Amino acid sequence: MSYPTILEVVPGSAAAAAGLVVGDELVAVNGVLPSDVIEYQQLVDEPEVELVVRRSGLDLGLDIVKEPGAPLGLRLNSSIFDRVQTCDNHCEFCFIYQLPPGMRKSLYLKDDDYRLSFLYGNFTTLTRFTELDLARVVEERLGPLYVSIHATDPDVRSGMLRNPRGATSLRWLRALLDHDITVHGQIVLCPTINDGEVLAQTCAEILVRYPKLASVGIVPVGLSRFNQEKSLRIHTQAEAAADLDTIHFWQLIAEERLGRRMFFASDELYLTAGRPFPATEAYEEYTQHENGIGMARAFYDELDRLERGTPLLAPEVTGEWRTVPAAPA
């Protein structure tokens, strides 16, 4: 485990008053080396915080007294302090495999870490999820989480993930929901693989097995010019239209049974099918906006508000001129 490094000390904060500086390494908080920023935040919420930091090879002990729940005033270099749980799936549609060579190393990191799902909305397949992970999520109420489903058929799912554990790892999804952890799902549609009848089966079984899912975003596979999987292709207009019909059908069933639509199609499917975007209310709370679902409708709604008279320019501008250093070339 590497020690997290301080990137910023907020002026006027408890950390600044204690003498912490940029570059200090965080060795322990209240006698514990936190494994991630989640555990760190829980530890520093206490009114009395004991820190051990490493500076120039020397360990320094600091006692800090602050208001309970008040921020300590540090920004650290990473959210995960022990080790990111990497992905051992080999999905043929994985976007990491479709990146060009020669880019920065961090872009090639395939994570399958529930902590990054909680912190940033990353999708996890749960193929590396464990009993210990479940216990922590339940105890600390770490939600919402985001889970890649793709298909409920074990053979189809394990084939898409190219991992035999893909056939069984959705048991963790059921366990999370049974403990009332909020979970959003995702289905990446690959033509002839998990669309058509497989998609209909997946939607039907989700309603039966996982009715507590907060939402299920359904997005088409994305391919770059660096894709090496010759069996993959994007949707035709007819395929996109057929998948939208399936999604809309199961939306109606979900609304009848659960009082909410549950299933939501990406903007790209509507564009590919040549169909208009649904009305605002069809997206309910825009729970998968960052997954490309409802962005176009939200944009149109914003334009409508502007056309109805919302001023484009602020009525008054105050402040002072400042110079900003240019970014390095």
Sequence positions of predicted segments:
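PDZ/PDZ-like groove recognition
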Residues: M1-V10
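Short alpha-helix capping/helix-loop boundary micro-motifs
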Residues: V10-A15, S35-V37
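Terminal peptide-recognition signature
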Residues: A15, G23-L26, L51, C94
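Conserved PDZ fold ligand-binding element
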Residues: A17-S35
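Short, Lys/Arg- and Gly-enriched loop/turn segments at beta-strand edges
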Residues: V32-Y40, L60-L62
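Short, compositionally biased
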Residues: I38-V52, E67-G69
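Conserved Radical SAM active-site core
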Residues: G57-D59, K66-K212, P220-W250
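Hard-cation-handling environments
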Residues: L244-A329
